[in-house]
């Protein structure tokens, strides 16, 4: 009887130890995934900031295009030309799929440097060196990317009593975490005053 009791107690101790070990492993994995998602979120925020500098300035980069916004044509889709890369007109999903993922996923997944339609972090602000990346360690695996979409909302015809006219742009940015599959997409709307003479 005593032997059975001892074996039962040892079994209970082993089960409790196994469950505790599993909980610790799951907690550590959860913390790692959360850190990875937070890294991707912060990278997407940085891309939004870079796009805002791209649109509004101050920007002293040789590739800067602050004065071009409002003047660039905004047709359907996104531009892949070097000087207006990442600038888009109206983006619409296919008639059968109305999700935002269907609009932006093909744009951000294109890695071909000659046909890509997104702007990379620092491409037009000369801040590339401000965002280190690494395939190992605690840095994002890729630099964040963004597209700037000309909003259909127009505020160019506002009277002086209401306020100054401005153009509105929708920025969509994607940030990557420590793993390429960890991605966070953020959007923001920027309004840029239109110069009036």
Regions found by a protein language model. Give the residues of each.
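Terminal alpha-helical segments
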Residues: 1-6, 10-197
């Amino acid at each position: 009887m005593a032997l059975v009791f001892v074996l039962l107690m040892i079994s209970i101790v082993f089960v409790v130890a196994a469950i505790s070990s599993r909980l610790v492993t799951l907690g550590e994995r959860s913390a790692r995934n959360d850190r990875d998602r937070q890294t991707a979120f912060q990278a997407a925020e940085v891309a939004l900031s870079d796009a805002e500098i791209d649109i509004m300035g101050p920007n002293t980069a040789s590739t800067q295009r602050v004065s071009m916004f409002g003047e660039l044509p905004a047709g359907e889709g996104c531009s892949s030309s070097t000087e207006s890369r990442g600038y888009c007109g109206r983006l619409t999903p296919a008639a059968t799929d109305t999700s935002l993922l269907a609009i932006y996923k093909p744009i951000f997944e294109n890695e071909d440097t000659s046909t890509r339609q997104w702007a990379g972090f620092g491409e037009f602000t000369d801040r590339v060196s401000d965002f280190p990346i690494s395939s190992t360690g605690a840095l994002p695996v890729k630099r964040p990317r963004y597209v700037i979409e000309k909003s259909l909302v127009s505020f160019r015809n506002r009277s002086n009593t209401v306020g100054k006219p401005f153009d509105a742009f929708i920025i969509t940015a994607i940030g990557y975490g420590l793993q390429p599959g960890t991605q966070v997409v953020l959007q923001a709307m920027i309004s840029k005053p239109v110069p009036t003479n």
